[in-house]
Amino acid sequence: MIKILVDNTAYKKFFAQHGFSALIEINNKRILFDAGQNSITLRENLRLFNEKEGFDYIVLSHGHYDHCDGLKYVIENDLINGKVIAHKDAFLDKYAGNRYIGIDEEIKEYLLKKADLEIIEEPYKIDKDIIVSGYVPREYEYEMEEFQCIKDGKRVKDEVNDDMFLIAKGILITGCSHSGIINVVEYGKKLSEIKGVLGGFHLVGVSDNYLNRIVDYFKSQDFWIMPMHCTGFKALTKLSQLNNFVYGHVGKIIGI
């Protein structure tokens, strides 16, 4: 099953937060996909789910604070029981304008020096039913927010090449889809059958033309969608009119 631990909206007593995290329990494995932006929200939502055990794998969709900084709770409570899977660019210093949006430096140092870190660029199979995408090819046009990062001592445009997703028994879980949600899904189809797509679609502030293209794309698909996090209210409103739309929030449990 998949449990939504962090999202911008929450059900009943659960806590909402700008960010994303999901717990995937499959084939006797516990996989934490992202960790939200701080310890408090992750801790409290795990408590409300009555989740006390550690994680066999941690997968980072990309190196932004709202997906990684909740790892402080995981590290401090010794809940990492296995590999941490990430792209090398997740550890770059990242900015939105003058605002630092990368991974907290203490967390970054721990992951790089003490964790069993698996750096990937190509698809990585955890087992026969679980695959992490690695780098997502950008074959279809998409609109992207302007980010910067530090490379070789210089501040340059960040293409967010560390953007990755995970597929568990046909359910595609994406953190922010900085590669473009159509690119994410179409690449996912090359790796696995797709039965559903959930997570951040990153459609805040996009043009009407692009948003309409996304809506038409999902209207033509035969799997369910659960847009969350950075999808945005306007896009959620339009996507919610589709027959394959499912509402997602913290506290949601999805069977797989």
UniProtKB/Swiss-Prot annotation:
GO terms for molecular function: transferase activity. Gene3D superfamilies: Ribonuclease Z/Hydroxyacylglutathione hydrolase-like (3.60.15.10). It holds the Pfam family Lactamase_B. Disulfide bonds: none annotated. SUPFAM superfamilies: Metallo-hydrolase/oxidoreductase. Belongs to the metallo-beta-lactamase superfamily. This is Uncharacterized protein MJ0448.
